[in-house]
Amino acid sequence: MGLFDQILSAIDDPNQQANPNQLGNILGAVEQLSGNQGVNTGTTQLAMSVLGGYVRSALQNVRSQSGDAQAQQIVNQFSGTNPNPQAVQSLFGAGQLTQIVNDIAQRTGLNNATVRAMIPVLVPLVLNLLKTGSNAQNPAQGSNPVLNTFLDADGDGDVDITDTISMASRFLNQRS
């Protein structure tokens, strides 16, 4: 089951946090970031997808070294729709961040300064997508199928965040 399918499942499950408003807030933040940076939404989604690969790798390392609960703790603590440099610092060192900025810039055509400005917004948004599978009453407890799907992906380097954002947008448009 893909990432968006897991998010839809979480929306249908009252025991999980996902809801249409949460998805709408994430989509709205992507659109606002795009507007603020003068970048089209598709490019922002591509940047988010490339960054998602690095977030997955960082969370996989956390999970292998400290367990599922610590990976979930990072998702819970740093997810959101506002810029959060601490979210970036919790996952990436300074040297790794330079590599990430260069990779995103190369793959999107954006300049490094724009990418560097976008990352503190995009990391919390990626984590917010992953938080949709958290337990609604006690996010630190229980399994998070959205996070598990994300972390257990096939490792082909393709994180389906762009597809997930596009499908979420269509899903929300059909509901309105």
Which residue ranges define each predicted feature?
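A structural "flexibility-hinge" signal
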Residues: M1-S176
